[in-house]
A protein has these predicted regions:
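N-terminal membrane-proximal hinge/A-helix region immediately C-terminal to the signal-anchor transmembrane segment
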Residues: 2-158, 163-166, 170, 191-202, ...
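Cytochrome P450 catalytic-domain helical core, especially the substrate-recognition surface
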Residues: 64-105, 123, 149-232, 244-299, ...
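Conserved cytochrome P450 K-helix E-x-x-R motif and the immediately C-terminal K′/meander segment
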Residues: 91-112, 291, 295, 387-429, ...
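Conserved cytochrome P450 catalytic core segment spanning the I/J/K helices
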Residues: 180-181, 282-359, 392-397, 420, ...
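Central I-helix of cytochrome P450 enzymes
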Residues: 223, 227, 231-232, 285, ...
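Cytochrome P450 heme-thiolate "Cys pocket" and heme-binding signature region
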Residues: 350, 467-500, 524-526
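Cytochrome P450 heme-binding "Cys pocket" and the immediately downstream C-terminal segment
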Residues: 370-372, 439, 494-530, 534
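Conserved cytochrome P450 K-helix/beta-meander segment immediately N-terminal to the heme-binding cysteine loop
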Residues: 441-471
Length: 554
């Protein structure tokens, strides 16, 4: 690995892990830069307003809020050293309706890796510097979830995803032991593989008649089924039937995002939540999710009590029901049903959303790069020999893992992390922040910065090829933070990676796929990066997989 990089511009920035010149692919993912490429469906933005038409509203502040932020900073003798971005409506008119994190990247190129942005009723310090991100994420006592907790409490309640202080410490300590190695091994065989195989079975009809399929939708169904079985031992069966939970989760997450930039937090007024259509829709969505989780908890609790089950070993797995819910109930921890519901709801939402997005964008990137796709399928064929993957196979699927990590670099989930300063602090670079200051850590900016990554806008899986541990925030010095970092790093990172590797291995082993031409692949956000209109592909059964399966059965 090369020496640590400076974020100061250099004549020839080096990649974090040097790609092989002969094997590295050179396609460009969905990004601001590729929107003008002829016949390229990877444009990152929705179409702009028509000439002469009314200007759409924006999450970004009007000019007067930017001016006010700049005036207040100057008038108070700010001294923070943080430049104020000119967030004019015209600057983002071509991005409206698309991905909200893309304007942040545009302004980073103009103002540098840290700047102040007036957005709605607040001003944010936007960070695209790994050293500053490391400082904020590691100093948990100085920086809290803040705004994130405020706007998503209606969904997560007191769940560990947004809890603070002693409650967060206690809940994380209770949940983490359930994600042990033996549990993950069981999930690979009994959940991840089987759900992926059910997806392949579902797609066989489309493979025979050539019907285009929305792979984003299919991956969302797959991951909901997987998270249902792994967390609750319950099959949502969304691959074969419509699931109201998927729509409810997406509606709730979009509401949380909207609340973060509302000019007035009217959703704090209870009676308004009963009459405003957007709030009515959000409350109905949360009710669907909570009712589902509460019923599953009650059913499992009844079984555990009737059997008198207790955990008798560190890596405990109930053979009939290896779910996280069963582990938590069998641990006999004194916790209210409400708290347990909120904790498990956090896992349901985060686990479903994140992995579905990882699968969607990795498949998209592979569909645009024949060389990497061929290399990934050859590796899968060599390692698996026509059989389903096992837990022991995962470490052998090195190139496929590189593809997933590179997808996470280009399309991080979430693309932005938000923290709030609880005390006065001085950031690396001598930038000063006051108590109450909201900070946006733009993971997207860090992952796309040409000062951090060589060929930053290109899909180069080989940059992550290493014989050592998988890349993470620690061994990349916070240049790669797909699962956040510090004490509040995602507890399910290994779970998400294993599920992604297994699902893609099964899919690549059994199916060929091509992107439907002339479709516009644009981005929007919930908690993760979604496509605006789906990811449509045509699939076919692989003859290689059938031959290998036949050979291995002899």
């Amino acid at each position: 690995m090369p020496a640590p990089l400076s974020l100061r511009p250099s004549p020839s920035p080096l990649p974090l892990l040097a790609p092989s010149p002969r094997n590295a692919s050179s396609i460009r993912p969905c990004s601001v830069r590729c929107s003008a490429e002829k016949n390229d469906s990877s444009s990152s933005s929705a179409e702009g307003p028509k000439p002469g038409g009314p200007k759409p509203s924006s999450w970004v502040s009007p000019d007067w809020l930017t001016s006010l932020a700049r005036s207040l900073a100057a008038g108070a003798g700010d001294g923070s050293g943080i430049p104020v971005a000119s967030a004019k409506l015209d600057d983002v008119s071509d991005l409206l309706g698309g991905a909200l994190f893309l304007p942040l990247f545009k302004w980073m190129k103009e103002y540098g890796p840290i700047y102040r942005l007036a957005a709605g009723p607040r001003n944010f310090v936007v960070v695209g510097d790994p050293a500053i991100a490391k400082h904020v994420l590691r100093n948990y006592g100085r920086y809290a979830k803040g705004l994130v907790a405020e706007v998503s409490e209606f969904l997560f309640g007191s769940g560990f995803a947004i809890a603070e202080g002693p409650l967060w410490t206690a809940r994380r300590r209770a949940v983490v032991p359930s994600l042990h190695k033996k549990y993950l091994s069981v999930m690979v065989d009994r959940v991840f593989c089987r759900c992926a195989e059910r997806l392949v079975e579902k797609l066989q009809a489309a493979a025979l008649d050539g019907t285009a399929v929305n792979m984003e939708e299919n991956f969302s169904q797959l991951t909901l089924d997987a998270i249902g079985l792994s967390v609750f031992n319950y099959n949502f069966d969304s691959l074969t039937a419509d699931s109201p939970v998927i729509d409810a989760v997406y509606t709730a997450l979009k509401e949380a995002e909207a609340r973060s930039t509302d000019l007035l937090p009217y959703w704090k007024v209870n009676f308004l939540c009963k009459i405003v259509p957007r709030q009515i829709k959000a409350e109905k969505a949360v009710a669907v999710i909570r009712k589902t989780v509460e019923e599953l908890i009650a059913k499992c609790k009844e079984i555990v009590e009737s059997e008198g089950e207790r955990i008798d070993q560190e890596e405990y797995v109930n053979d009939a029901d290896p779910s996280i819910l069963r582990f938590l109930l069998a641990s006999r921890e004194e916790v209210s049903s409400l708290q347990l519901r909120d904790d498990l709801l956090s896992m349901l939402v985060a686990g479903h959303e994140t992995t579905a997005s990882v699968l969607t964008w990795t498949l998209y990137l592979l569909s645009k790069d024949d060389s990497s796709l061929k290399k990934a399928q050859e590796e899968v064929d060599r390692v698996l020999q026509g059989r389903p993957p096992t837990y022991e196979d995962i470490k052998k699927l090195k190139f496929l893992t590189c593809c997933i990590n590179e997808s996470l670099r280009l399309y991080p989930h979430p693309p932005v992390l938000i923290r709030r300063a609880m005390v006065s602090d001085v950031l690396p670079g001598n930038y000063k922040v006051d108590p109450g200051q909201d900070i946006m850590i733009s993971v997207y900016n860090i992952h796309h910065s040409p000062q951090v990554w060589e060929r930053a806008e290109e899909f180069v899986p080989e940059r992550f090829y290493t014989e050592g541990p998988l890349p993470n925030e620690t061994n990349t010095d916070f240049r790669f933070i797909p699962f956040s970092g510090g004490p509040r790093k995602c507890v399910g990172d290994q779970f998400a990676m294993l599920e992604s590797i297994v699902a893609l291995a099964v899919f690549l082993e059994r199916m060929n796929f091509v992107l439907v031409p002339d479709q516009k692949i644009s981005m929007t956000t919930g908690a993760t990066i979604h496509t605006t209109n789906g990811l449509y592909m045509r699939v076919s059964l692989r003859q290689t997989a059938q031959a290998l399966a036949s050979t291995s059965s002899r």
